[in-house]
Amino acid sequence: LQAYRRHWVAVHERPVVGHDLQALADLRRRHAPLVRQIRRRFASPLAGAPRRERRLPDGDAVDLDAALDAQVARRAGHSAADDRLYQARPLHQRSLSVALLLDCSSSTGFAIPDRHAPAPDTAADDVLWMAAGSRPSLALQPPRRVLDVTKDAAALLCEALQAMDDRHAVFGFSGAGRLQVDIGLVKDFGAPWAAPAGAALAALKPQGATRTGAAVRHAAQRLLAEPSRRRVLIVLSDGYPQDSDYGSGAQALTYGLQDTAQALREARRAGVASFHLSVDAAAHDYMRHICPPHRYWVVEAVDALPARMLALVRLLARPA
């Protein structure tokens, strides 16, 4: 029938409360080179709001430097003092709101293989260590999960957007069927990117399924309430859309892909641009059915995602 089902999906948005107020400081230390790069690159006038135009014949405010120069010139007896004494905002003032949707489904709890880990012990190694009398103690670190890396990438995005003074919000999403689509509000548009938001981001846990279409529609509606001229939705996921009631077999995959693609089309028609980042190495197989090739990236090395996110921010920093 090509029609929507009324009251078919229930989305529940709730604030995420975190208790680790050191999480943001820890992240900034962990990614210190990238954070320094962000502050150097994105806190500059080239990245943020354009400078006011000065020394104009008319404008919305007096240019104090120009007025002072004109006064000095008059007192010095110069009759042809410059009368361009005003300043104004550029006509194309930067105005951007960004919403980040972070996939928190169960699969994001999978551990990432450590490319720098030593090779597994062999039987010969055991014999050698027994002869030496002991095996050296190694500090065991818990394995990094997909969600740990995507949360770091989300935090670095917030660092850059805050440096540019752009409004931004972060939502985690997961669910368990059409009546339980969970949206965790990590940071709202008007809230600062500070320790409480960092703690909320750190508190996100992998759980449930990936009903991406419903999450996209919800985030798009939140963006449409924003006063900015440009509205951008970024979806960060580790796999294709799936939920318990999508059906079985190929039908389940087709349903999720088509629903997500339709949600993104609706958002675009309403004035919300979108970009999709996937850390699934096989994502090209299905992402081309969700959005055009220039609207998604596949990051095959998950631990390269934070740096890749900064490349996306550079695109956002360009004038509309």
Language-model segments: residues:
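Acidic/polar low-complexity segments with low predicted structural confidence
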Residues: 1-98
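Glycine-rich, charge-decorated loop segments at or immediately adjacent to ligand/cofactor-binding or catalytic sites
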Residues: 138-139, 283-293
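C-terminal helix of von Willebrand factor
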Residues: 293-320
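Short secondary-structure boundary/capping segments
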Residues: 114-119, 184-190, 247-254, 289-295
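Von Willebrand factor
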Residues: 91-236, 241, 275-281, 308
